[in-house]
Structures are given as structure tokens and as C-alpha cells.
């Protein structure tokens, strides 16, 4: 969850205050309606940082890839960079080959109990219309290359679709299917 990520950052960087801002107004509105919790959007979070006298702004997005929301975030931060002495923006989770390898290690370690040859292990991400959607195909290719032949990667909103994953699973003679998220938040 986002809260667990924030807690880990606070522990790792105790000299910094951790604050939350979401890029999706749809999610902000949903959380407000469901939980009556107000979350800043990017503009509000940046304004709050300026008003609080923040000198060094460090932004660590929880995006999986360099998609449209990440690009919009980077652009908005750049427009406001003069309001701070220093601005640092982290990269999304799946940026370098080493990132992919680390995620593959984490997800296969977390699901190894299911990897019995009779179970298809499927990970679903959000997906995007942007070129960055290729991270899902790359993840699938790397899983296959590393011998994880019972692992499948798909997306909710793009390619490979759920139907694509189901078709691949049907090609095997699996007795069970395990479905896991490849996302931080559920989205809209």
C-alpha cells in the first residue's frame, strides 16, 4: 500500500517529512467519498510544500512505469522548480533492466509456493495507451527467459489484455490459477 511505502521512506530518511500527493483526481475523489479522507493532488501538494517553506523537494513517484501520469508529474514539478532550492524526482519502479530483475525476483519469491507446474501465476497491471506499456511485454519476456514458464503478465486497460492472459493460460494444462496485482493501487 501507499502507507507502507511512506512508512519505509520515513524510516530510511528520518531527516525528511513524507507527504502524500496523488496524480489521479479520480482516485482522490473516490478516497474522499469512500473514506472521507482528503488527499492533495500534485498542484496542492506543491503549493503546500512552498507554503511550509520546504527548501529541498524530493518526489518519489509510486508509478510502475514512465507513463502519461509520470510525465505529467515531472512536467508540473519542473514548472514549480524555482520555488525550491533543490528538486529531486525519483524514477518509476520499472525503469532499468536491474529494476525488472529485482521485481521479477520479488514476485517469483513471493509466489514460489504456487509454482508447481499445475498452477498458472498471473500478474495484472493497469496498462496504458502510452508507449511505456511495453514494460508488461518486457516483464513477460524476462520471466520466460529466466525459466518462469508458468508466469503470465497482463493489463486491465491495455495489452496484453486479460483475454490474452486467459488464452495463454488455456494453452497450458493448469489445474489452478493464481491472480496477483502488478500495481500499487487499484486505480479507477
Regions found by a protein language model. Give the residues of each.
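Active-site-proximal alpha-helix that buttresses catalytic centers in soluble enzyme cores
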Residues: 1-188
